[in-house]
């Protein structure tokens, strides 16, 4: 298996969020790198960034560095273009795991890989998700996953829904090439019950710091 880590340093909401200190002297990248090295060889890890300073971080762990075109950064990037640019240079025909560093609390990679090995013949991809139990309304206040009045259902009886965590995706190489997306057409849902905080804003960063520190004892 090859691992791809997309690592932007140009976040407009949190400056250098992926490489600034998060816990003690470790950045979000450092934390994820150490988690990955618990189950994968460093030569199988490929890090894509628009900033050449990240190469020094990759050298520290023995990871492969891929310099990214700045045009493939930001929130307006066409996802298939990004997926293709980051996965085409990765050698081999084995599976690809796409791992984000912005979810430091997620560390169930070993269990996910074991489950993937068991279901790989029946699915083209794996996506890490968390069960969602809540009552949803659209922007016109119409119920989405339940009904008002007599037909109301308590949360325990709502139809199963899942939140994509953006922490881990695993895809067969042919699925990556064909669909050029994080998820194939027949994904396996890897369900985690662990607390997960995806860091998009400064408040998320600070909250994740508190929780991560608590979990470290």
Where does each model-flagged region fall?
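N-terminal nucleotide-binding beta1-loop-alpha1 segment
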Residues: 1-15
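Short glycine-enriched, charge-decorated loop/helix-capping segments at active-site entrances
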Residues: 17-23, 70-72
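Conserved SAM-binding loop
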Residues: 21, 47, 98
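A short, N-terminal amphipathic alpha-helix
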Residues: 27-45
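Short internal beta-strands
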Residues: 45-49, 128-129
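Short phosphate-binding loop-to-helix
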Residues: 52-97, 105-107, 111
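Conserved core of the sugar-phosphate nucleotidyltransferase
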Residues: 101-193
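Catalytic donor-sugar/metal-binding loop of nucleotide-sugar-dependent glycosyltransferases
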Residues: 177-197, 202-217
